[in-house]
Amino acid sequence: MLEDISEEDIWEYKSKRKPKRVDPNNGSKNILKSVEKATDGKYQSKRSRNRKRAAEAKEVKDHEVPLGNAGCQTSVASSQNSSCGDGIQQTQDKETTPGKLCRTQKSQHVSPKIRPVYDGYCPNCQMPFSSLIGQTPRWHVFECLDSPPRSETECPDGLLCTSTIPFHYKRYTHFLLAQSRAGDHPFSSPSPASGGSFSETKSGVLCSLEERWSSYQNQTDNSVSNDPLLMTQYFKKSPSLTEASEKISTHIQTSQQALQFTDFVENDKLVGVALRLANNSEHINLPLPENDFSDCEISYSPLQSDEDTHDIDEKPDDSQEQLFFTESSKDGSLEEDDDSCGFFKKRHGPLLKDQDESCPKVNSFLTRDKYDEGLYRFNSLNDLSQPISQNNESTLPYDLACTGGDFVLFPPALAGKLAASVHQATKAKPDEPEFHSAQSNKQKQVIEESSVYNQVSLPLVKSLMLKPFESQVEGYLSSQPTQNTIRKLSSENLNAKNNTNSACFCRKALEGVPVGKATILNTENLSSTPAPKYLKILPSGLKYNARHPSTKVMKQMDIGVYFGLPPKRKEEKLLGESALEGINLNPVPSPNQKRSSQCKRKAEKSLSDLEFDASTLHESQLSVELSSERSQRQKKRCRKSNSLQEGACQKRSDHLINTESEAVNLSKVKVFTKSAHGGLQRGNKKIPESSNVGGSRKKTCPFYKKIPGTGFTVDAFQYGVVEGCTAYFLTHFHSDHYAGLSKHFTFPVYCSEITGNLLKNKLHVQEQYIHPLPLDTECIVNGVKVVLLDANHCPGAVMILFYLPNGTVILHTGDFRADPSMERSLLADQKVHMLYLDTTYCSPEYTFPSQQEVIRFAINTAFEAVTLNPHALVVCGTYSIGKEKVFLAIADVLGSKVGMSQEKYKTLQCLNIPEINSLITTDMCSSLVHLLPMMQINFKGLQSHLKKCGGKYNQILAFRPTGWTHSNKFTRIADVIPQTKGNISIYGIPYSEHSSYLEMKRFVQWLKPQKIIPTVNVGTWKSRSTMEKYFREWKLEAGY
């Protein structure tokens, strides 16, 4: 229970590990079997949840039933004629393991002194996970994918390799072994009522071996050209070529069935595990045996690791869904009968006929691929874009000599944004076959958290493809105004002898989309989006019926997202590409998902296979020409979001491309990114953001940084170009206030003289935009009288007093330390209507002493230490600027200069304060007081610094001045006790540059403002309401 609570607190989701109770009469029969298989004499983790994970992994391997087929697929060897309902009951019984019986096995199989032994094999190198030492399977696969292959030599043992030495799998490749393991898969044959349709299957293809494929290209091409069928996998009990090539399982459905193919892309090769189609023009009609597919076990990577397990009562995960659009010309139409399967014909190019003459029927098939570890991973397609051949033939980006047909691969991000749809072909001629996309009532669709294939709404694809192909492939497409019209391909450009049946398929790129929801693109925007150059052949004659996925959501452990992260791929760039280099699709978490907050790319350069390829997007629509140099453009990513979620709020940003309709808004955002914002990547800051505006997540400047009635903002540089802002004020030079300022900033900045020097010398802001104002002097800025007052915070820190034309007086304190001396400043007789208050320590627990008292304590302590030990070194911790009063006072008493780094020395020189310049030096060996960064004031850092002094000092007395040290711990400075370790003592002195609670209270009650607006710790309603309560109490006490 504690574990569940901890996970919920950390990851913000409820653990799903606790299994659901089921009827003992239904589930108990298979429980012992599940537990026995989970353990099987091997060590499982001593926690019950780990045993349940292992049981689930075994369950999924033993019962390879896709989620979509769970209630409808039957085993040929056992119950081919069994009903759909029986299949559902059997699946649920096998996959449900009550927690009670699982716990009873704990004492029998737990051996905490034995290292865990994992089942399965690495989907990339094929090393058995049982050989892992000190690694989990997930860890190993992650490293295996990231590390480049060391060898291209195939293992001499081939299929018989049983090595358990990890280095062996680095020394040799194991392509044949991977292929063999992928092929050992249970299948069921088609039902006589299938009408020649193929149904869902679970691919055994485990890994995308891009690097290893090259050594097998010639062999594959030769075997394909000689054999009538394409064989890419081995089957133990499937002697005929027809059986071996089809890797298809029958999906027994109530009314309709779907055709599915399993393909695999390796090194720019698209290999169909469908039928090899002859090059002649004859129809191929091969009978599909009903009971010949073998019922073999499948060997691949474990589906659940020790850190990633779902409820046992949930069905095993279906893998990636594919939608095939099968285009057949008039001559190459699909034929079907009760006993045979329709096959595609092999052509080298599509015969483009007139629309009226031949309207090819596109038969849509919803398919799924089981644990397709590397299938269609776009990082393996490094050169997808190819120009159109000069002989006017439509060329694909792959060498399709070894395929069973010409396949057109939609980019996954493009397909992923389209609505989930099931397409049906229309009957135009009675002699042409028609396949209906089948999806029975009991069949479940799952939108995976990981990469899964897209079901595409064809009208959207149509609108996306028409205009781009008119411009890129002139004469290839003719746009039609309605959804029902069929696009025709020009017959002038292609050879009539090379007509083809082509299949277009798309990947589902939505991980974890909430059930029943689909992320779609605006049709109008898509119609003007240039399509990738490698989409050359379009399906024709399509209608669609949109359907929503069901509520079952499970994890997909495919190799690209084995760790909950989309796989990396190299980004393709075109010459002259704009600032937009990639658009990351961050999916919306589903309520049933685990790791909703873990599946995020850290590196912005890590583009997933769910992204658009930047080289396929038109520069004029996706970027705005900016004034700064190209190198700066390439360093930033401006992420666009145009995803519309049906009935759900987005918890994480969905970044999609929105083109012409929002170009103006994008221009506004990106101009500031270049000219004003500099190198700051605003997307990484956790700052309040507005809703989806202009296709980009634009940060919103909070109201407490705006001065009402003016065009002024205070310390608001990190929010981009603030609408209506005519002058930007900076209170002091601390990074949390000047964040966003850089040398590219081109708006007027008003600050103190010291802060202006720091901006010019440290941030290199152009001097023409820096407007220093004197202290205690009335100045006119854009018609508003402004006065800067000392804030007693750090050098150059100021409070800003605004006198609005309507008589309203506003005081913005910035960061300040209230002091009684302020009561004798220009505020003495001033009525303040609104007070923007620094509320850093607005809580009664912060009752630290005054600065003068702390400085006296530090002086006395340092003087005593140096007097007792002349070789003692005094060290003070500092930030970039601040805490100067402490070390300057100590150095003055000890009669020594303050030694510091060159960088710190330059910073203090910018202050132009004579008293400071006379007491600082970079010669550390000649001074008794040293300055170090605050983060180095610890025993390890100080010990290291002591060694650098070459033995001149044998003791360190360090001061860490910070107000946090004193929070709710001490009431007097005398109570401060040092931390001592050896010859190093560290004093955490309560020297703060922010007001304590009592100082703040005194200042407010003296100033008597009509309204107080807190500027710090305002992130939650609770903290704001608490401070409001304090303000009311202060007002009542003061009687105003």
From Swiss-Prot:
Pfam families: DRMBL (PF07522). Induction: During mitosis. The mRNA encoding this protein contains an internal ribosome entry site (IRES) in its 5'-UTR. This 5'-UTR generally suppresses translation while specifically promoting expression during mitosis, when cap-dependent translation may be impaired. SUPFAM superfamilies: Metallo-hydrolase/oxidoreductase. It comes from the Eukaryota. Keywords: Cell cycle, Cell division, DNA damage, DNA repair, Hydrolase, Isopeptide bond, Metal-binding, Mitosis, Nucleus, Phosphoprotein, Ubl conjugation, Zinc, Zinc-finger. Expressed in brain, heart, kidney, liver, pancreas, placenta and skeletal muscle. One of its GO terms (biological process) is interstrand cross-link repair. Residues 1-190 are annotated as: Nuclear localization region. PROSITE patterns: ZF_UBZ4. Beta-lactamase activity is inhibited by sulbactam. Residues 53-65 have a biased composition (Basic and acidic residues). It catalyses: a beta-lactam + H2O = a substituted beta-amino acid. Changing residue 838 to N: Impaired nuclear focus formation, reduced interaction with PIAS and increased sensitivity to cisplatin. One of its GO terms (molecular function) is 5'-3' DNA exonuclease activity. PANTHER family: DNA CROSS-LINK REPAIR 1A PROTEIN (PTHR23240:SF6), DNA CROSS-LINK REPAIR PROTEIN PSO2/SNM1-RELATED (PTHR23240). Binds constitutively to TP53BP1. Binds CDC27, which is itself a component of the anaphase promoting complex (APC). Binds PIAS1. Belongs to the DNA repair metallo-beta-lactamase (DRMBL) family. This is DNA cross-link repair 1A protein. The lineage of its organism: Eukaryota, Metazoa, Chordata, Craniata, Vertebrata.
